[in-house]
Amino acid sequence: LPGLEPDWTRIWTYKEAMVPPSLPTSLLVIGSGAIGIEFASFYRALGVAVTVVEVQNRILPVEDEEISKLAHKAFAKQGITIHTGATVKQLSHTQDGGVMARLRTANGNTAEIAVDRVIMAVGITGNVEQLGLEQHGVTVDKGHIVVDEWCRTGATGVYAIGDVVGPPWLAHKAMQEGVLCVEKIAGLEGVHPLDPRSVPGCTYCTPQIASLGLTEAVAREAGYELKVGRYPYSANGKAIALGETDGLIKTIFDAKTGALLGAHMIGAEVTELIQGFAIGKTLETTEAELMATIFPHPTLSEMMHESVLDAFGRALHI
């Protein structure tokens, strides 16, 4: 961002934030996507005073709005200061070795925040500049290489995977792209293209956040008639035994077909739980099959079952 370039000593990218020479006493995180929230949660757990600034009207803007609101509440309870609808207009070095940030707040006012360090967490892009890609028939659009469902570029024999082809910027998505790309080149039978709607996204903060498929808002905008189920951690025996009663499992179904459109979670170990719904969505499992599936007791996974049941008015334990 113009005027907000990292200097790698006081104003960090995610790389410097991974290996700080010393622990700052205060930190400003610009951006509240997965990277920003993970660092905010991590540094707050170490006792750092953390402030998060997000230009959108809520943190974790790509997540389901209900999950985003619960996350905001949880982080605020931990002592993280959050400014949404705000923009960082200027960063300047201070004589004490810190940084002064000038913000435009949601109500249009100007505010200043003095911190030890700043993390720029406004997103990542692959390195595609000045490689001469266009000269060889590879199309680059808005910083990303354009590929088809098999990761083929516009140049014969040239494939691209991972961050350079655009979101979601996830290691497991890039790995699967690499596998299907090589299998397609090798001529293996039964190779399936990657469906981005079946790629689980995980944010490793406290509480954890995980999601899959469409959010409720996006599904409604797409014209689906929905069945939405919810189940709280506070009603699950395993969560109570673990002392982890803050959280929610939310499932979204097509009311006409019973297809699982999305699953959204916040709470302990949801980054492990989400894979169950990823398998179900990949196999095109319906609500009837999920409701008929036996989930072991006592486990956190029972909340997944209860959320599905709740979507169709059949929840058992709430």
Spans of model-derived segments:
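Short glycine/serine/threonine-rich phosphate/pyrophosphate-binding segments
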Residues: 1, 35-39, 45, 127-128, ...
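FAD-site-proximal beta/loop scaffold in flavoenzymes
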Residues: 7-24, 112-189
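A Rossmann-like FAD-binding core segment of flavoenzymes
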Residues: 13, 46-149, 214, 221
